[in-house]
């Protein structure tokens, strides 16, 4: 059963901003992409909220909850959840001392309109 976070829990969560290309955000928002691959993991503990900034000046288009960050060892399994081909994950890992982390994606929310970084109090 999927975990549902209540407003008090959401308010207490750390917030991370993640920059994504439009195509990956669309797959995430559609529920197809349930794992985001990164060479790093946040300093904060999971679960945490992730604001999704879409590159190209689109702004923050939504958010999700990351219930857990996993070290990826099986690239074929990660391919299914991330929609990134296993050979691309292998190449990506080669540039990061072979460590790739999978940020689990849950409770995706699309905003009705793009929010600018400035509206969030963030200066570029």
Protein language model annotation of sequence segments:
Residues 2-124:
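Structured alpha/beta reader/binder surfaces that contact nucleic acids or chromatin modification marks
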């Amino acid at each position: 059963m999927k975990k549902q976070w209540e407003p008090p829990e959401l308010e207490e969560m750390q917030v991370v901003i993640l920059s994504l290309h439009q195509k990956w955000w669309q797959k995430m928002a559609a529920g197809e992409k349930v794992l985001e691959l990164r060479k790093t993991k946040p300093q904060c503990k999971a679960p945490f909220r992730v604001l999704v900034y879409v590159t190209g000046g689109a702004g923050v288009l939504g958010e999700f909850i990351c219930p857990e960050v996993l070290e990826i060892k099986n690239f074929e399994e990660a391919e299914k959840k991330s929609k990134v081909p296993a050979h691309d994950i292998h190449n990506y890992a080669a540039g990061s001392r072979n460590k790739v982390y999978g940020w689990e994606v849950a409770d995706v929310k699309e905003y009705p309109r793009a929010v600018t970084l400035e509206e969030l109090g963030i200066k570029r």
